[in-house]
């Protein structure tokens, strides 16, 4: 089985027709489903949050079979993920896609579990400490995209689980947990 870094690629990745949008509806639906799963699994395993449709992305080509996804195929597969609420287009031209391998609510739950696991109830942290502090090392929060983290924190703020406060810069933004 072919690997990309430490990620095992599925069998279909070596099947040339899967790099071309299939004309038969049932086959295309299966193709889209396989690509959605592959993109989400790969992004989660590699902690990738942004995909540029026009940029080099390891899954968009397979040199072993000399195949690459067309722009249309890339946009189709990413749009299918967007349609499931697992990604969002960051621009009207569909050039950049924010990948949500966890939905925002799930990220919010991960933050709450992180707070409980580390005894941080009624504590204050900066947003950067949540992303890259000692407590986050080895957790799913380590290196989380700032946009995703802020949306999860705002969701928790709306539920009364924390208070966000501004510092003098983005690095100083604070979080007061009240779990």
Curated annotation (Swiss-Prot):
Keywords: Endosome, Protein transport, Transport. One of its GO terms (cellular component) is ESCRT II complex. It comes from the Eukaryota. InterPro entries: ESCRT-II_cplx_Vps25-sub, ESCRT-II_cplx_Vps25-sub_N, WH-like_DNA-bd_sf, WH_DNA-bd_sf. The lineage of its organism: Eukaryota, Viridiplantae, Streptophyta, Embryophyta, Tracheophyta. Belongs to the VPS25 family. Component of the ESCRT-II complex (endosomal sorting complex required for transport II), composed of VPS22, VPS25 and VPS36. Component of the ESCRT-II complex (endosomal sorting complex required for transport II), which is required for multivesicular body (MVB) formation and sorting of endosomal cargo proteins into MVBs. The ESCRT-II complex is probably involved in the recruitment of the ESCRT-III complex. It holds the Pfam family ESCRT-II. This is Vacuolar protein sorting-associated protein 25. It is found in: Endosome. GO terms for biological process: multivesicular body sorting pathway; protein transport. It comes from Arabidopsis thaliana (Mouse-ear cress).
């Amino acid at each position: 089985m072919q690997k990309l870094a430490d990620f095992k690629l599925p069998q279909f990745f070596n099947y040339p027709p899967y790099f071309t949008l299939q004309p038969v509806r049932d086959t295309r639906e299966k193709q889209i489903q396989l690509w959605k799963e592959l993109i989400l699994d790969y992004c989660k395993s590699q902690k990738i949050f942004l995909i540029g449709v026009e940029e080099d992305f390891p899954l968009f080509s397979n040199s072993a079979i000399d195949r690459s996804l067309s722009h249309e195929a890339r946009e189709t597969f990413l749009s299918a993920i967007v349609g499931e609420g697992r990604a969002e287009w960051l621009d009207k031209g569909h050039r950049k896609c924010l990948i949500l391998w966890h939905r925002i609510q799930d990220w919010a739950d991960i933050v709450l579990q992180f707070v409980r696991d580390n005894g941080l109830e009624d504590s204050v942290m900066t947003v950067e400490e949540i992303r890259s502090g000692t407590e986050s090392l080895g957790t799913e929060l380590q290196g989380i995209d700032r946009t995703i983290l802020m949306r999860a924190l705002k969701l928790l703020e709306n539920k009364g689980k924390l208070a966000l406060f501004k510092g003098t810069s983005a690095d100083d933004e604070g979080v007061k947990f009240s779990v």
